[in-house]
Amino acid sequence: MRSLVVVGLLAACSSPADVTPDATGEVDAASDASPDAATGVPLAGFGDLAGMCGVLADPELTGASPAIVHATLTFTRRFDDPADRPLLTTGGARMMATPNAGGSSGLSEAFAYEQLARCELAPLLKTETEIVYDTTGKITDLLVSIDGHKIGVSVTRAVAYPFGQPYTLSSATTLLTRKLEDIQASTANVSAADRWQKQALAYMSWDDQSTAMLDMAWSSIDPAIKGDTILIITTTHGDDQFLYSNM
């Protein structure tokens, strides 16, 4: 286990406000915001969230170019489910209470959503099993709304096992390529009722080294595979192993 990065306990344990519905070249999202006085983001919640917050607007949400966003999430203690669900946003708590379509990634999916809810005020529209598709095939993990635009979100993790091993560029490139191709497939399959404007690929990244490999992999990916995807990398610190363990 890496050494614990101690941050304000209030940020880890205060109750968050509810989040309610309401080309060429890569888009470079706006600079770090922690917090933004105009929008009040990031919202309080479980873990100290910082980095590029409140940065997704029409150029990123509707444009034909890909974009990349970096955030950090630091935990003073591990998440205790279900006792800590009240510390999540309404959508995050709903995700924790709803089975996904299989696998062991429920916590990482919930905290990837928390980043969107706390930074971009994104209400959860549908969970993985609620999204409707026209044909059987690749699916995405959740459907959210950002500034009135439906955005599909696929979630994955950048981590090497056993914990502490370096995350290789080869591993980063292989997984990133596969996930981007899956995004194109699920976009082709989704029903008209649930059709999103575009998709985001949300990574929970084990450490700064893993994130560096992701950045290198992203820069080398064929633009045709990137498409218009928004890559969101949330690097986690502190007592975060619960996000990367099989649950």
Predicted regions mapped to residue ranges:
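A short acidic/basic microdomain associated with nuclease active sites
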Residues: 117-145
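Active-site beta-strand-loop-beta-strand hairpin of nuclease catalytic cores
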Residues: 143-155
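Loop/turn elements at helix/coil->beta-strand transitions in domains of secreted/extracellular proteins
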Residues: 148-151, 196-200, 227-228
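Ser/Thr-rich, Pro/Gly/Ala-heavy low-complexity intrinsically disordered linkers and tails
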Residues: 1-42
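Interdomain/boundary linker segments immediately adjacent to catalytic/signaling cores
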Residues: 38-118
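Catalytic cores of nucleic-acid endonucleases
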Residues: 156-220
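Domain-level recognition of nuclease-like catalytic cores that cleave nucleotide substrates
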Residues: 200-247
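A structural signal for short, well-ordered beta-strand segments and their strand-loop junctions
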Residues: 125, 152-154, 203
